[in-house]
Each structure stands twice: as structure tokens, then as C-alpha cells.
Amino acid sequence: MELRRCQPSDLQAIIDLNEIIYAALPDKSVLRHNSPEMIASCLEEPNVTLGVWDCNLLVAIGVLYVPQCIEEDHYHDLGLHGDYRPANQKLFLVREGYRGLGLQRQLIREVEKVAISRGYNLLCTTVAPNNAFSINNFLKEGYVYAKTEEKYGGLVRNLYYKTLIY
């Protein structure tokens, strides 16, 4: 398997992965249904989308996302004070059949490296409260629970953050 930065030419593969995963979810509240436009924005600077490929098959993604609107700006929800340059970890998707291989945790760490290289020192993420697998992965990677709130037009989400050390 190969980890690499996704390019605009990978957009359809990412959309397909998102749709396959979303369609298979028994509880749709676990994942926000992402529009093609939102996914395309994850490929545009200053955002970075990392993908794991098994030959020509996209099997997992993770996104470093720099918020452009208040709904996506989780830093302000934290109420932290200090010299922070925040960004978000967003949209971790792992194809069925590739789960349990540590790909989400690998992507979390790789997105952190990208964030540090770009000068970000605080990462925020949201996770559905009933998504124990993702919650455990973020906690194992040192993220701290902040609070539970309604986001994204009515979806309940736990908010987590991590201060990055250069």
C-alpha cells in the first residue's frame, strides 16, 4: 500500500469512496454526507488530502482542513486562549475490508506531520458520539475530549483537540 497526497485528478475516487462508505452505514448519523463540492474543496490549498492506495484502489483518506467558515471553525468552539494556529483533521474514511489495519491512526499521524510542516500547532476534530472506533483512535493519538455539541445542521458531535509540538 502507498500513502500519498491526493490530487484533483483523484476527486472521483474520493467521491466514490465516500459514497460507498456512506451507503453501507447502518446509522447515517455517524458520517456527514459530504457533497462533491465539499470533497473537492479538501483538495484545494491550503487543505491537504492524504490517501492510502492499494495498487489503483483508494482505500483510505484523511484531510488537513483549514476552516473557511464559522461552521467548520472548531477552534472557536473550544474557548482556548493562547498563541494557536489551528486547523482541523477531517473526513477519515477507510474502505471495508481494510479496516482494522491501523490506517486511520496512520493517517491521523501523517496529517499531523503535514500540519506541523505548515505551521499549525493545534488540530481539532469532530466525531459522532456513537463512533467508538474513531473516538478510540483519536484518544490513542493524544486528542483531548472538549465537549459534545450539535454541528453540521443538527448532527451531534464530540469535539476533540490536540496541541502539536514542533
Task: Name each model-derived stretch.
Residues 99, 125-135, 153:
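Conserved beta-strand-loop-alpha-helix junction that forms the acyl-donor binding cleft
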